[in-house]
Amino acid sequence: MNGPTTITELTLFITIALAALTLVLPRKYLLLPYVVGACFAPADQTVMVGELDFQVLRILVLVGMLRLAIRSEIVPIRWNRFDKLLLAWFVVGSVIYVLQWRSMGAFINRSGRFVEWMCLYWVFRQSVRSWRDLRFAYVLLAVCALAMLPFVALEWATGTNPFAVLGRVVTDVREGQYRCQATFPHAIMMGLFWATLVPLFVGFARQQTQRRLLFWAAVAASTFMVMVTRSSTPVLTLAAVGVLLAAFPLRRYTSTAAWGVVALVIALHIVMNGPVWTLVARVGVISGSTGWHRYALIDAAIRHASEWMLLGTRETGSWGWGLEDITNQYILEGVRGGAVTLVLFCIILFVGARAAVRLSVRWQDKRESYLAWGVFVTIIGHCLSFIGVSYFGQIAMIWYLLLASVAFLYGQVHEAPKPVPRRAVVARTQHAY
């Protein structure tokens, strides 16, 4: 059965305006409609066309593809290992999902998702071909952070969401405190959206002199918007990225630190009375947080691994009370696409993080090096967020923007010439004379 069209007239007007901008703006400004749409257009409103549903972002993706085609702006891109891993993740996850459900509805659903994900990634891959392109995207995001700040502050002070005029946007209350969410479908999504932007806001603030004040102001605005969501996952993610940004001088020891974390987790699992993932239930910085649900979901997924390892599983409600709500991206990957999809997802995260660290260590200029470190910290921020939530809504835009940026970064690491040690240069010079 088809769902109803839920988009309001005002949201539809905004969508049409953004689509028009996507068609007419110069290529260097192509990311502008996507950034503005992600920040100011609700993601949970749809237009139904037959069996197909179109949200704002999906409409903009299709318009962006059309624009690149009709204006002959498609630039050949050499696909690297990261691109191929991402394509494999898309394809394998979609195929296994269809095999799991074995229905035309599942085929249509995954086909639509596959086209949306690949097209969004491809449009961003076409748009992010240099650090200048990425900087422009983050300038736009910083401006949007400052533009959204007064609206979120009003929601925090009054409990009335100014974006309610767009329809279907409300403000929840937890323990007597408003959980602000602006245009986002959930307060946690808004918090994580801004929390995971902070590392590169800081990175560009340290690199740029002209727009330094803009980026630092965006950091402050993002921090405020994270805190007023009254959600533990965004707050903990923000704290974690802050600690990792401060660890920049120790970037050469990242591999050692990672193995140390693995050893610590194993040691805790051995000495604790319960499994190490019970720590998830105990971590909470906001009153009323549901860490117990995250723990129960992880525990149930491990106990029921035989149900989803091969082709995923159709439902998780039988695992326990409330566990049909999969608030863990890693588990969602396994439930929808089995162990193969989950492993590919984890490999993508690992390869991207390693490429960012290598580039950060390689660069001699500290400002450039810190920028690459900011990409690494952003990836880790998402990795931590995935433990407490599965992504939906506007945050998909910055997630795929990050993936496209990492693909560009991976090319920098593996295609750029390696620096020659100074000793070798001196030896060659002496030999020449």
Cite the ranges covered by each PLM segment.
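Interfacial loop-to-transmembrane-helix boundary motif in multi-pass membrane proteins
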Residues: 30, 79-91, 112-115, 124-154
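Loop-to-helix entry and N-terminal half of a specific, functionally important transmembrane alpha helix
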Residues: 356-389
